[in-house]
């Protein structure tokens, strides 16, 4: 009998267990495609970023000009930059859908996998933030100034911390240089953590829409789910190409076409769209330190979700009351995203404050209490 090399070779064996002979539940839906799509996004971002880094100059006098040079003079530089900028947006769309899937189907009960995922989200946000500073446009400069300034809210060490991150007394050349270094380094850290994320996932196996044990009904990952993922790849590449070729500046800010000027403040300082929900929560609290803590907690609250699971069922597919509040949470997050892009005036301030309270209430009180109520209703039958 011929020896199958993929099952015996030390390197190929790892790939085989992860991508070919991996036992997968037979009933996982399209919602389980986003993990592989995130892997594709990461590869696209690393490759396009590498080519951009070859032509970019991390100096405040040349950064803006070097981006212009990439778009005008480098072969297909405009395309690489558009793919990289819009690829980030698609990355975050996939991340948020991936998290929503995890919340809906109870995937967060794989605690190690879930918590590493939350750390990955935090690193992804940090990477996107430092990357947004690199073109050195108006919004890059002022965004960096405002967000890094938030660290001054921490007692005693705040001002020292801000100056340490800036490398001086204002956002300057030292800041840009270190942000470029971080932006180059962090994606590789994300890549390493992704491998650990997968390692923990493959220890338990994937969850499924029913939220029940699927050991009795599993099929191999290849060819079934490899081809299913391939369809997702084509759809995502088509969307990315459409965005990058037809409306490359749709999700960007017009202010960033103006070179950074420390003497002129833009009328509305706001981050990229994928940070607006957290930015709205930050702005809705009048106290600076309170706002910073709420901003951090808006992401790290996801780590509390496994601890707040009170239901006897894993998935919320059979829990209509919790389903209602889950969709409230989705709508609430969309409202926060909209509020984050609006000026700081009434009625936006009030709506933002109500949406912020709702966001934390749904996670900490309403959904756990609803699950507990559903348990009581089930026990009555």
Swiss-Prot record:
Q: Which residues form a coiled coil?
A: none
The free-text cofactor remark is: Binds 2 heme b groups non-covalently.
Give the CC-aspect GO terms: mitochondrial inner membrane; respiratory chain complex III
Biological processes annotated in GO: mitochondrial electron transport, ubiquinol to cytochrome c
What the entry lists under InterPro entries is as follows: Cyt_b/b6_C (IPR005798), Cyt_b/b6_C_sf (IPR036150), Cyt_b/b6_N (IPR005797), Cytb/b6-like_sf (IPR027387), Cytochrome_b (IPR030689), Cytochrome_b_C_euk/bac (IPR048260), Cytochrome_b_N_euk/bac (IPR048259), Di-haem_cyt_TM (IPR016174)
Chief localization class? mitochondrion
Annotated residues that bind heme b b566 are located at 98, 197
- Residues at which a ubiquinone binds: 202
Q: Which GO terms describe its molecular function?
A: metal ion binding; ubiquinol-cytochrome-c reductase activity
Specify one Pfam family: Cytochrom_B_C
> In what way does this protein cross or attach to the membrane?
Multi-pass membrane protein
Q: Which cofactor does it need?
A: heme b
Keywords of the record: Electron transport, Heme, Iron, Membrane, Metal-binding, Mitochondrion, Mitochondrion inner membrane, Respiratory chain, Transmembrane, Transmembrane helix, Transport, Ubiquinone
**Which CDD domains does this entry report, sorted A to Z?**
cytochrome_b_C, Cytochrome_b_N
**Where is the protein localized?**
Mitochondrion inner membrane
Q: What more is known?
A: Heme 1 (or BL or b562) is low-potential and absorbs at about 562 nm, and heme 2 (or BH or b566) is high-potential and absorbs at about 566 nm.
Q: How does it assemble?
A: The cytochrome bc1 complex contains 3 respiratory subunits (MT-CYB, CYC1 and UQCRFS1), 2 core proteins (UQCRC1 and UQCRC2) and probably 6 low-molecular weight proteins.
PANTHER family, from UniProt? Answer: CYTOCHROME B
Q: What task does this protein carry out?
A: Component of the ubiquinol-cytochrome c reductase complex (complex III or cytochrome b-c1 complex) that is part of the mitochondrial respiratory chain. The b-c1 complex mediates electron transfer from ubiquinol to cytochrome c. Contributes to the generation of a proton gradient across the mitochondrial membrane that is then used for ATP synthesis.
Protein family: Belongs to the cytochrome b family.
Give the protein's recorded name. Answer: Cytochrome b
Q: Which source organism?
A: Negaprion brevirostris
